[in-house]
C-alpha cells in the first residue's frame, strides 16, 4: 500500500510495504538493461510497493555518474508509475548528494534514499546538517538510511527526531540490527515518519514494534513471499507471517555469508535472472560448502512454491 503526501506512520504512511533494493545486472562491464527490465517486471507483478535502484545492493559505489543517472531514468520510464522508485542518491559529500538528488528529482522519482556519509565520520550535528541540506534541495520525500556497519557512523534517534521536523524527511531505513534503538526511534518519531527494516531477518520483529515494512535484498528473488509476509502481519494473520519468516530465516542469514550483494547476485544468476558479473573490488561468490548450502536452501524454497 502506498500513500500520498501529508501522511504519517499512524495512518496512511508515505512509505510502507516491501521496497526491493534491486541489483544492477552487468554484461561485458555495461548495465544489462534487458535483464534489468525483466527484473522490474517481476517486482511489479509481485506487488511490491517500490524498488530502490542505485543502492548498496545495486552496487552504486562502482557505477559511474552517468550510469547512475541513466539507471534511475530508465527505472522511472520502465515502471510507468506502477510502483514507486526510491532512488539511492547518497554520498559522503553533501554537495554531491545534493547534485544526485536534484538530478533524480528531475527524472521523476517518487522518493530518494540518502545514506549516512561514510569514511569522513561526521558528528551528530554534521549528520543533521547533511540530511537537512539534502532535504531542502529535494522536491520528493526523503528516506534516511542508517547503516553504521558500512558507514562507521550511527544516526541516533535523537538526531532523527530533529530531522523529522524537516519538511521532506518522511521515512527511515534502519539497518543497525539493534531492535532497542529501533524501538526508541519509533517511540520518538513514529507519528511523523515511517520506519522500515534494512535487514530482511528483522522485518517481522520490526513490524511487531511499529515498523511498516522493509527495504529488502531477498525480494530480488522472492518478492511475492516478502510481500505476503508484510501483508499477512498487517492483516493480523500473524501465524502466516511467522511461517514465512521461519521458512526464510536460514536464507536471511546465508544471503550475507559474504558482503552484500555478492550472494544475492550469485543467486539471481543461478535462477537465470542475470549474468554472473559483479564489479571490483567485489568478487564472485566463493564456491564452497556454505555457498552450496545457500543454493540448496533456495531451491528448497522454490520447491515449496515461494516466488
From Swiss-Prot:
Belongs to the DapA family. SUPFAM superfamilies: Aldolase. Homotetramer; dimer of dimers. InterPro entries: Aldolase_TIM, DapA, DapA-like, Schiff_base-form_aldolases_AS, Schiff_base-form_aldolases_CS. Pyruvate binds at residues 57, 215. Its main location: cytoplasm. HAMAP family: DapA. Catalyzes the condensation of (S)-aspartate-beta-semialdehyde [(S)-ASA] and pyruvate to 4-hydroxy-tetrahydrodipicolinate (HTPA). It is found in: Cytoplasm. It is an enzyme of class 4 (lyase). The active site is at 145 (proton donor/acceptor), 173 (schiff-base intermediate with substrate). The record marks 56, 119 as: Part of a proton relay during catalysis. Its EC number is 4.3.3.7. Keywords: Amino-acid biosynthesis, Cytoplasm, Diaminopimelate biosynthesis, Lyase, Lysine biosynthesis, Schiff base. Pathway: Amino-acid biosynthesis; L-lysine biosynthesis via DAP pathway; (S)-tetrahydrodipicolinate from L-aspartate: step 3/4. GO terms for molecular function: 4-hydroxy-tetrahydrodipicolinate synthase activity. It catalyses: L-aspartate 4-semialdehyde + pyruvate = (2S,4S)-4-hydroxy-2,3,4,5-tetrahydrodipicolinate + H2O + H(+). One of its GO terms (cellular component) is cytosol. This is 4-hydroxy-tetrahydrodipicolinate synthase. It comes from the Bacteria. It holds the Pfam family DHDPS. GO terms for biological process: diaminopimelate biosynthetic process; lysine biosynthetic process via diaminopimelate.
Amino acid at each position: 500500500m502506498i500513500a500520498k503526501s501529508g501522511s504519517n506512520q499512524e495512518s496512511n504512511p508515505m512509505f510502507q510495504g516491501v521496497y526491493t533494493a534491486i541489483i544492477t545486472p552487468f554484461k561485458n562491464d555495461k548495465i544489462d538493461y534487458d535483464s534489468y527490465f525483466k527484473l522490474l517486471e517481476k517486482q511489479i507483478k509481485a506487488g511490491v510497493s517500490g524498488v530502490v535502484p542505485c543502492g548498496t545492493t545495486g552496487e552504486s559505489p562502482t557505477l559511474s555518474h552517468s550510469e547512475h543517472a541513466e539507471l534511475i531514468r530508465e527505472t522511472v520510464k520502465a515502471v510507468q508509475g506502477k510502483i514507486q522508485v526510491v532512488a539511492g542518491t547518497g554520498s559522503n559529500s553533501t554537495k554531491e548528494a545534493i547534485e544526485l538528488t536534484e538530478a533524480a528529482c528531475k527524472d521523476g522519482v517518487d522518493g530518494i534514499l540518502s545514506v549516512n556519509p561514510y569514511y569522513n565520520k561526521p558528528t551528530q550535528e554534521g549528520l543533521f546538517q547533511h540530511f537537512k541540506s539534502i532535504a531542502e534541495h529535494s522536491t520528493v520525500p526523503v528516506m534516511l538510511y542508517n547503516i553504521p556497519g558500512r558507514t562507521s557512523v550511527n544516526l541516533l534517534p535523537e538526531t532523527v527526531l530533529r530531522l523529522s521536523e524537516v519538511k521532506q524527511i518522511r521515512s527511515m531505513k534502519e539497518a543497525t540490527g539493534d531492535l532497542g534503538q529501533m524501538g526508541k526511534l519509533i517511540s520518538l518519531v513514529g507519528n511523523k515518519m515511517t520506519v522500515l527494516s534494512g535487514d530482511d531477518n528483522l522485518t517481522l520483529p520490526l513490524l511487531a514494534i511499529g515498523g511498516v515494512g522493509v527495504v529488502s535484498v531477498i525480494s530480488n528473488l522472492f518478492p511475492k513471499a516478502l510481500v505476503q509476509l508484510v501483508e499477512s502481519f498487517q492483516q493480523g494473520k500473524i501465524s502466516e507471517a511467522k511461517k514465512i519468516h521461519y521458512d526464510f530465516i536460514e536464507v536471511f542469514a546465508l544471503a550475507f555469508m559474504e558482503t552484500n550483494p555478492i550472494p544475492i547476485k550469485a543467486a539471481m544468476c543461478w535462477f537465470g535472472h542475470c549474468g554472473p558479473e559483479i564489479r571490483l573490488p567485489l568478487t564472485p561468490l566463493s564456491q564452497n560448502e556454505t555457498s552450496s548450502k545457500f543454493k540448496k536452501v533456495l531451491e528448497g524454497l522454490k520447491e515449496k512454491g515461494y516466488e
